[in-house]
């Protein structure tokens, strides 16, 4: 018989670790729970150097938390994944995952094997997604532009810009429609990254504006340069245009003093030749991420070109994509010679420096390859502008998803209530042991309407009971099928037809959040053993394994 292997750390197994994981997930969900819905509250997060962030965006809250527990980290990554994949629904996905875990833990405590629970959850998720696609989808073609505006307003309702929802919803829809392009397969695409969001504090929210073109928070390099260029040919450079200096450590021994002047002259000429090569191709707008010194600016002024220095690399890449330019980090080709060709230039109808709000901006209008748009946000202070930007990002992603999938579902807890009733009935039709797991899955979903009602200071028990009664009637009685659009009206505290009220969410937000939440719950549920290794102290001369050998723990 072998002796036990000495593990240099702590080990917890079975029910203890499962309960610990469920508790960790519940505590993460409790942090974001109160920020769900149109009347959700904000969180103030202060980091270790004192920077303050005020937000109610689930993904941002969880990103800024320093979470130690490994199971809690899974939920933080889950919110981040939902934010990257869909852009909205980050808070609800965490709440659903935590609730699924809590109910699964109850089943495991009743001696039902985790594998049965997992297969039941998978089946329930699959069935829920099928039910959404067959019964709850509203096609956007029949609703038109209003549908996009309503989806954007629903996304913004819980945010700081929700008060001016009508204004911002129109702005967001116009911005997304402005950047539409068709890919190789003929599918319309809406790259949200093509929309540049600039923030300027001061004035009111309502003075935010949408600009047709890419706005750069830069000015021309010299006052002598033209402020407007029509039929612009744009060169995008990722290096500095400055007098070439020899590298440190290079030693040149000169016997003739005149040679020193020649070296200095050559240093100037190298940069001059580069600029002449760029200008010879017809370039009249030069954007660079580095600096441009006065000597180089002189050549651009003489040529009547516009040069802009210290452009952000992110902006340069987007402009290159929109105008069809190539971003160059050097002019050297494979032979080691410096060349610049006209094919590397991007094209735009007009590049102009304008005074917008209180700042000078450079606008690149009607780019050749793709269209671009910019939004300038105004707000009382920096915290507000940052939160407005996050809210706008969510709304842009929602409108993009609606346009690409061409379908929406009713919001306000309608989908969760309908699925809860359907899955309860579906569970009773199952003869296998997954029945209990599907019933628990169904019991977990009303946590969303429940939390919405609690956050709105309404009687959640009463409201959710009424909501479930409506949905039960809709599924049992074919004549009253239209009751399936019933969701919560959180202002007046009663159920209402959310299809008529215009409370819409993209179908993909609901489908993905159900799938992601189920997968996260299953991932944590499968864990039955946690081995946490102790950090190896520097004083120890032996590692954990060596300690075990010396202590005789490994002897047979």
Swiss-Prot record:
The modification Phosphoserine is found at residues 6, 551. It is an enzyme of class 3 (hydrolase). Residues 536-549 have a biased composition (Basic and acidic residues). Its main location: cytoplasm. It comes from the Eukaryota. One of its GO terms (biological process) is protein folding. The modification Phosphotyrosine is found at residue 181. ATP binds at residues 37, 89-91. Its EC number is 3.6.1.-. The modification N-acetylmethionine is found at residue 1. It is found in: Cytoplasm, Cytosol; Cytoplasm, Cytoskeleton, Microtubule organizing center, Centrosome. Residues 536-556 are annotated as: Disordered. It catalyses: ATP + H2O = ADP + phosphate + H(+). GO terms for molecular function: ATP binding; ATP hydrolysis activity; ATP-dependent protein folding chaperone; unfolded protein binding. Keywords: Acetylation, ATP-binding, Chaperone, Cytoplasm, Cytoskeleton, Hydrolase, Magnesium, Metal-binding, Nucleotide-binding, Phosphoprotein. Belongs to the TCP-1 chaperonin family. Component of the chaperonin-containing T-complex (TRiC), a hexadecamer composed of two identical back-to-back stacked rings enclosing a protein folding chamber. Each ring is made up of eight different subunits: TCP1/CCT1, CCT2, CCT3, CCT4, CCT5, CCT6A/CCT6, CCT7, CCT8. Interacts with PACRG. Interacts with GBA1. Interacts with DLEC1. Component of the chaperonin-containing T-complex (TRiC), a molecular chaperone complex that assists the folding of actin, tubulin and other proteins upon ATP hydrolysis. The TRiC complex mediates the folding of WRAP53/TCAB1, thereby regulating telomere maintenance. As part of the TRiC complex may play a role in the assembly of BBSome, a complex involved in ciliogenesis regulating transports vesicles to the cilia. NCBIfam families: chap_CCT_alpha, thermosome_alpha, thermosome_beta. This is T-complex protein 1 subunit alpha. The lineage of its organism: Eukaryota, Metazoa, Chordata, Craniata, Vertebrata.
